[in-house]
């Protein structure tokens, strides 16, 4: 059976919490091999959409599919997910945690891979430190490494560079782009429009639980008379929300 052109499909998706509807009839697809931006102000439904896609939330209505079917725990070996909330074994050493997850994910040389990655992100001197001794940004780098270490076919990232300075943001964007160059499809949430400009092929802007704009970056700009993505964000969500 041939694989569908879209690795992610969201159809007629509706999500309600406590009687309040936060997602209203949302439809979009992520094409195989692209980098797709899921954009919106705080509370627009981005994270809820990802969690429903991964089976962490039950949609009120609609269908959310990965590779043409609902997500199951077994799909975790081909889907890498970096959540907004970072959760690691805080009392364990960095290298031990990375090696453990590498073994779970089928990485052939997990310890060697982990050390090479830690060198890349300037954390090799922290390899034998306990996770709890690391800053939040350092923990975020470690968790990104765990997420990508088995070359997932689909990489889902919820604000992967949040809180980083420009140098480290660029470093992480370079790493994410390298994963993409190896063949991964990437679905990412970000509030940094320069990342969207640099990385994303297409994007969707959510507002009030619905799609405000959807398409290639060029098409979205054209819809707003070719202003910048930052200007579009302010125009759509208002200066107070942005």
Where are these regions (language model features)?
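ABC ATPase "signature
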Residues: 214-215
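A short, surface-exposed alpha-helical micro-motif characterized by mixed small hydrophobic
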Residues: 196-198
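Catalytic Walker B motif of ABC-type/P-loop ATPase nucleotide-binding domains
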Residues: 155-159
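Conserved ABC ATPase "signature" region
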Residues: 99, 103, 109-126
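Conserved ABC transporter NBD signature motif
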Residues: 62-77
């Amino acid at each position: 059976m041939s694989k569908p052109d879209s690795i992610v499909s969201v159809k007629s998706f509706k999500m309600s919490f406590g009687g309040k509807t936060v997602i209203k009839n949302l439809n979009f697809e992520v094409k195989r091999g692209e980098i797709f931006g899921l954009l919106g102000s705080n509370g627009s439904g981005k994270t809820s959409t990802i969690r429903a896609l991964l089976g962490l939330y039950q949609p009120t209505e609609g269908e959310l599919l990965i590779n043409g079917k609902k997500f199951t725990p077994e799909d975790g070996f081909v889907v890498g997910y970096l959540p907004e909330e970072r959760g690691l074994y805080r009392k364990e050493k960095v290298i031990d945690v990375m090696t453990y997850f590498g073994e779970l994910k089928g990485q052939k040389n997990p310890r060697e891979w982990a050390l090479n990655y830690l060198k890349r992100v300037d954390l090799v001197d922290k390899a034998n430190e306990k996770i709890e001794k690391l800053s939040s940004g350092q923990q975020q780098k470690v968790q990104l490494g765990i997420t990508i270490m088995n070359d997932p076919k689909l990489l889902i990232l919820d604000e992967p560079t949040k809180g980083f300075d420009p140098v480290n943001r660029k470093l992480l964007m370079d790493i994410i782009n390298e994963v993409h160059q190896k063949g991964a499809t990437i679905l990412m949430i970000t509030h940094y429009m320069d990342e969207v400009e640099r990385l994303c092929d297409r994007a969707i802007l959510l507002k009030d639980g619905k799609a405000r704009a959807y398409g290639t970056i060029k098409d979205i700009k054209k819809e707003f008379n070719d202003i910048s993505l930052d200007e579009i964000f302010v125009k759509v969500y208002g200066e107070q929300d942005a």
